[in-house]
Amino acid sequence: KLAAKAKGLGIPVFYYISPKIWAWKEWRVKKIKKLVTAMYAIFPFEPDIYARHGMQVEYVGNPSVEELETRLEAAPSREDFLKANRLRDRKIIAMLPGSRRSEIRNNLQVMCRAVDMMPQYRGVIAGAPGIEDEFYRRLTNLPVLHGQTYSLLRHSHAALVTSGTATLEAALARVPQVVTYRANGSKLSYNIMKRLLKVNYVSLPNLIAGREIIPEQLLHMCTPDAVGEKLAAILPEREPRRLQLEGYDDMRARLGQNHAADRTAELIIKALTNK
């Protein structure tokens, strides 16, 4: 609505961070093309999607890269992290079950049962903002850490991650992972989703790399046994783990070195001054 209003007043519209038209509703590009002077994307695969509709979009870099690198550098040492959270010195499997109650409810119990199959590892949950401990306690007795997601990733051996931005964060932190998305767990929902989605993957690392570098266990395939099998494969220092880490390197290279906000500002100034 704001873009349409500005366009009607003759004000140039610069759009930083594209809506996720690549997931579904790609038809929105037609409306965006009419209203937006320039679009700046934060994922390297987005310009090609817009190009199919005759719209030129510039990839400016991804802000998560520098933010995560800064946060990881600020993370406490492993010794201090374990001591502060009263955790024993065992290899950690980070569990990021989502930020909404429905997501957490659908995914966490699958994650917990998968981690139970790895008794030599310790599952630790990244608590979502605004979700109280009591909610998690009704689902599991595993430790829940609030406001420490980046420290948790920094000191984890592997991760179970519900699809979303957290998959990119785990990849940038170089934590081998399995992606889970349970929802209602039905095969019918899976078939509907596959028809609606305009992309081959749901996780950002796979979308950015343009190939599967991390396993995605979705809906009816998101069972404790299936997730546990994929998790067990990436725990030892063997080929599945090595290949995933190499995939992360490829993904990171595709993201580039640009400071996204600075690059966007430069392009907007250039467009406004016609330089």
Segments from the language model and where they lie:
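Nucleotide-activated sugar donor-binding and catalytic core shared by glycosyltransferases
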Residues: 1-275
